[in-house]
Swiss-Prot record:
GO molecular function, one term: DNA-binding transcription factor activity
Residue ranges: DNA binding: 141-200
GO BP term, example: negative regulation of transcription by RNA polymerase II
Protein name: Mating-type-like protein A1
Gene3D superfamilies membership: Homeodomain-like (1.10.10.60)
Summary of subunit composition and partner proteins: Forms a heterodimer with ALPHA2.
Species this protein is from: Candida albicans (strain SC5314 / ATCC MYA-2876)
Amino acid sequence: MNSEIESSLTLLKSVEKLVQATSVYKNEDNEEIFLQLKRERQENSNSHEETETLFHESLDRLMKLSSIAGSKVQYELSLNNLYNLLLRTRKQEEEEAFIFPTVSTEEFALEQITFEVSDQMDDDKDSEDDILIKGEEIKKSKKKRQRLDNSTKEFLEKVFEKNKQPNRRERELIAEKHGVSLSQIRVWFTNKRMRKKEPKSKAKSSSNST
């Protein structure tokens, strides 16, 4: 008998950590309170099976403790707090089951190149005259050189909108992704920047002549 009481008291202590004590039911019959709680919960049950099992097992064991210990043990449970516990549990289960929306492979690759990769880069910025490379690199690039296809150009345009002067590591990633040489990528960005500057220069010279 004593071991059953000790075991039930241990359960009671663990339940009390989850449910705030109150004096609402202090002078009422404990067993009737638990039965009423169980009936109401069964009538309004929309929770997950695991949550329901925890709820009913806890009440059943507390009822057993009530019959053993009688008036020596006071049960003070708040129905609202017990329901709030179940609601919090359900919300947590729903949040854990949430699936994040997926993004397209192209968008993900673009974000990776223009933002995340920059954390691993050197602080040095390549200047525009960086286009001159060593003789060996020129020879290698000529052997492997191929024309940029439309899909590669479209991707470079997207990158250029976000970053007009990518560093060396970013250009290497782009070249590797599309199977072209590093020098082709560097030339493309240099030419693109120059073309962007030309209209401004022409507009400035025409305004000066007038």
